[in-house]
Regions:
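Short, cysteine-centered beta-strand-loop-beta hairpins and adjacent loop/turn segments enriched
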Residues: 13-27, 126-144, 154-155
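A short, surface-exposed interaction/processing loop segment used at functional sites
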Residues: 136-188, 198
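Serine/threonine-rich, repeat-prone extracellular segments and beta-strand-based repeat modules
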Residues: 1-11, 101-114
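Beta-rich interaction/scaffold domains
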Residues: 1-66
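Intrinsically disordered, low-complexity regulatory regions
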Residues: 86-91, 99, 106, 112, ...
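Short, non-transmembrane alpha-helical segments in secretory-pathway proteins
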Residues: 46-92
Length: 221
């Protein structure tokens, strides 16, 4: 479990007979080495290079926009968990914004953390939708969609390495629910950090861009 900057001291053990026989005497019995060149996991928002998370934010926004275009999935998440086509569906895409980011840093495997870290980008917008259902038939209000990435790390050159193919989604109707799900409930096994982005977008104006055709918390592991 070494990290860059750690030091390792090596102590030589040798036989006096070999020294006497071959006339070799080491200049020193010990030598200290500094660890370098290792990848290191992201452990804080502090000191991040400018633009370090740009690729993640581009990917997460693309994913959220794609989800919004999939009206059956979004409507299922915010109404009844089914994939039936909604009767009406309207989500504000013009005011879709990154609302906040969470960083969960493992306290160690002994605490039950499955990953070294998790980065969650939470987006906010508003929407309204309806469909006939035994469980509920409509939703109109705030929508918080979170995209979760795992095991972010920096290479030797300081570039952030992220597996963009391994992302999961959770859906919330309030910012507090998103915070409690990701931050509060994970404090037993992760150190948690938040980096607020912007305030929630205002309700869409009459001429705001929307996902055409007329949300309930979701969960992810």
């Amino acid at each position: 479990n070494l990290s860059n900057g750690d030091t390792v001291t090596v102590t030589a053990v040798y036989d006096d007979y070999l020294t006497e026989t071959y006339g070799c005497i080491p200049e020193s019995d010990t030598k200290t080495y500094t660890v370098e060149g290792l990848d290191s996991y992201m452990t804080s928002f502090d000191g991040l290079p400018d633009g370090a998370l740009d690729e993640v934010h581009t990917d997460s926004r693309d994913r959220v926009e794609s989800l919004i275009a999939n009206k059956e999935q979004i409507c299922g998440a915010f109404i009844d968990w089914s994939t039936d086509t909604p009767d009406t569906y309207q989500v504000d895409t013009q005011n879709l914004k990154l609302y906040t980011s969470y960083l969960l840093v493992s306290k160690g495997a002994d605490f039950g953390a499955k990953y070294s870290n998790r980065y969650i980008a939470v987006y906010h917008t508003t929407g309204s939708m309806s469909k006939k259902s035994w469980f509920g038939d409509s939703y109109n209000g705030d929508m918080y969609i979170a995209v979760d990435y795992k095991d972010l790390k920096f290479d030797e050159s300081g570039n952030l390495i992220v597996n963009l193919t391994d992302a999961e989604y959770t859906y919330f109707t309030t910012a507090d629910n998103a915070y409690n799900y990701w931050m509060t409930s994970n404090k037993d096994c992760y150190k948690v950090f938040e980096q607020k982005a912007v305030a929630p977008a205002a309700a869409p104006a009459a001429d705001a861009a929307t996902a055409d055709t007329a949300p309930a918390e979701a969960s992810a592991s």
